[in-house]
Structures are given as C-alpha cells and as structure tokens.
Regions:
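Metallo-beta-lactamase
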Residues: 69-119, 202-223
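Short secondary-structure boundary segments
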Residues: 61, 151, 177-179
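Short, Lys/Arg-enriched N-terminal segments with co-localized hydrophobic residues
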Residues: 1-13
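Pre-active-site segment of Zn-dependent metallo-hydrolases
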Residues: 23-59, 66-77, 81, 97-109, ...
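Active-site-proximal beta-strand elements of phosphoester/diester hydrolases
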Residues: 15-18, 33-37, 92-98, 113-115, ...
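Active-site-proximal loop/helix segments of hydrolase catalytic cores
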Residues: 103-169, 186
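Binuclear metal-ion centers of metallo-dependent hydrolases, dominated by the metallo-beta-lactamase
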Residues: 17, 108, 173-233
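Conserved acidic residues
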Residues: 54-55, 145, 172
Length: 233
C-alpha cells in the first residue's frame, strides 16, 4: 500500500466509528470490520454494544474496559492481543509493545499501540498508553493519517503528555479518547484539558458532531487537525 496514493484512492464506503471510551470500529472498502478495545458496560458506565460481522478485534491489554470480546456476536473473528505483524481481510496490522504506566509496566503492565493500514490509510490506536513515546517508538510508528489517543490521565497519559505525543508524531487527524464524559464512571480529566494544550501549538480543532467519520479523500487534512467526535453510546 503506497502512502502517497491516499489522496487519489476512492474510499466511499470506508468509515471509522467511535462507540465509546477507547472502542472504535473501522470498516474498509471491502466491508470488513476491525474492532479495537471493546469495553464492558458495568466497568465504564457506557451502554455495552452488541456487534456482529466483526472480522478482527484488537485488545491493547487485558483490562475489561478494553478487552470485552463478549460484545462480539459472531464466533469467527481473529483476535489480536500480542505484539507482532498480522494481515487479514484487507488489513495490515502492526502492534507495538509499550507500557500502561510510566514505570516500565511495574504498576499496570504492558500495552499495545496498534498501527492498522487499509485502503491507503494508516491508523494508530494508542490503547491505554501510560508514557510519552521514545524516539525509536515514534520511528516505528511512521506516518499516521488518523491517531486515536487517550487524554484523560489517571490510568493513561494526561492532556499535556498526549499533546507531546502528537507533536512527536507525523499525523494528520487526531481523535482524543478515554476522557471524562457524563456517562463515564472513571475520574478522568475532560477533553477540554487536551484541547487547551493543542491550542497552544495552534492546532485546528473541529467539533465533529457524529460518531461515524466517513474517510473519503476529502477528509484527510493537509495540516494536522483535532477532531472531537461524539460517541455512539
């Protein structure tokens, strides 16, 4: 897949849906669906989704607000919960080992940052990243079209650290996740803290009043931009 072809490649059916918390569902042009970090309702406070026709699920770590595969109704899906390279259903997936805390995993264990490439676009989901990325990790992630990053602190990087990660990466679209909302039971910081940090670096910010982003050729901005989506649940 050639990165520089992304502006010319048709993606009429490609969508990214934010269900809630850190859970996203990516559908490629072929109609295959990749789910990331499905949550359990009783842990998070969000309504629990019931999903069918999921082809791949990525769990960044084993905590049940990120690894509740019981929400998937069909039995025949591929589960990825370890570091490595995987290819299936039009998705090329690389999972990069990181930590859930800033003490090399001694507090909360390991975490996977996932790179998903499909239909000429590269997506990066940071899971419950607990530390700022090192130079080698940044290099390994490469160019990113859409970044999903936790910003609420407490269990993950906070707003300031998230802004630092964004600054270090070559990214076009930034989608904050894992922050305090009306439904969320965790004592996380609100997304506004992250937006204030991004304004300091003069990033454009858009309130995207939908849970589904249609990833056609006109969606990808030429300059990095923050999109605050509305979750489905």
């Amino acid at each position: 897949i050639l990165y520089n072809n992304l502006e010319r490649k048709g993606r009429e059916n490609m969508t990214l849906e934010w269900l809630a918390h850190s859970c996203f569902c990516l559908a490629n042009e072929e109609g295959h669906r990749l789910l990331i970090d499905p949550y359990r309702g009783e842990d998070t406070g969000y309504k629990e989704p019931q999903l069918d026709k999921v082809d791949v699920v990525i769990c960044s770590h084993g905590h049940m607000d990120h690894a509740n595969t019981a929400v998937i109704q069909n039995p025949d899906y591929m589960k990825i919960d370890k570091a490595g390279h995987f290819e299936t259903k039009g998705f090329a997936i690389d999972t990069v080992p990181t930590y859930h805390d800033d003490e090399n995993g001694t507090k909360r264990g390991e975490n996977l940052v996932s790179i998903v490439e499909t239909d000429g676009l590269r997506f990066c989901h940071c899971g419950d990243l607990g530390h700022v990325l090192g130079k080698e990790q940044v290099k390994a992630l490469g160019k990113i079209d859409v970044l999903m990053i936790p910003v609420g602190g407490l269990f993950t990087i906070d707003a300031k650290q998230a802004a630092e990660v964004v600054e270090a990466l070559d990214v076009k679209i930034v989608i904050p996740m894992h922050y305090k909302t009306e439904a969320c039971r965790y004592d996380l910081a609100p997304v506004e803290d992250f937006l204030e940090e991004m304004k300091k670096s003069e990033y454009a910010i858009s309130m995207y009043h939908d849970s589904v982003m249609h990833l056609d050729g006109y969606t990808i901005p030429k300059r990095a931009k923050v999109y605050v989506m509305e979750s489905k649940y």
